[in-house]
Amino acid sequence: MARDLGPRGKMCRRLGIPLSRITAKDPDKDPVLRRPYPPGQHGATARTSVSDFARRLREKQKLKLYYGLMEKQCRAVFQEASRAPGNTGTVLLQLLESRLDSLVLRAGLATSIRQARQFVRHGYLHVDGKRADIPSFRVKPGSEVRFHAAHQKLAVVQESFSRMKSRSVPAYVQVLGEGEGLRYVRLPEREEIPVDVNEPFIVEYYAQRS
């Protein structure tokens, strides 16, 4: 499937997302925090009015960047969330947090959503003892995700956990051992999800186009 693999620094600056929020980048060296304005010659001085549509579109684009989604995937998850009981925006984020690649990132077993997806696709991980190699695999609360013993010892896996273990892990995820895997404890509350988006805007964006 086609995927946007452009420079994340530019994408983050354009959307105002600190690069350190989606990768292992040191916040002190984060280009978005050092230059909190869009890229380009006039990024720091440009003055433009922003329409309601542009605000909604921006929030949707931020969500896609946080989770590494294509438009078709993002719309499909929204449609599922809109059919579920509860607040659509919160349910949308809960569904995305329940993805296998998202949980691997939240547990600090990977340095970015791209690397988490790579670990999954290469078959490094098992969910409740069964191999899972689809990044969008929906993990159920109470399930355990573990590296296969041989893969857990790989240098890239060990290095990723070493770089990320100083980061805080949300309460709905429990790290098993020294980077052996994770337990998905429960569905997260909205305030626990480390994603800075205005989800009502995202709901409005898709609702107007359904």
From Swiss-Prot:
Annotated CDD domains: S4
Keyword ATP-binding included in the entry's annotation: no
S4 RNA-binding domain boundaries: 98-161
Keyword RNA-binding listed: yes
Listed Gene3D superfamilies: Ribosomal Protein S4 Delta 41, Chain A, domain 1, RNA-binding S4 domain
Keywords (A to Z) from UniProt: Ribonucleoprotein, Ribosomal protein, RNA-binding, rRNA-binding
Database matches in InterPro entries: Ribosomal_uS4, Ribosomal_uS4_bac-type, Ribosomal_uS4_CS, Ribosomal_uS4_N, S4_RNA-bd, S4_RNA-bd_sf
Stretches that traverse the bilayer: none
Gene Ontology terms: biological process: ribosomal small subunit biogenesis; translation
SMART domains: Ribosomal_S4, S4
Chain residue ranges for the region called Disordered: 22-49
GO cellular component term of the entry, any: small ribosomal subunit
UniProt cross-references to NCBIfam families, sorted A to Z: PRK05327.1, rpsD_bact
Family: Belongs to the universal ribosomal protein uS4 family.
Role noted for this protein: One of the primary rRNA binding proteins, it binds directly to 16S rRNA where it nucleates assembly of the body of the 30S subunit. With S5 and S12 plays an important role in translational accuracy.
Name listed for the protein in its UniProt record: Small ribosomal subunit protein uS4B
Gene: rpsD2
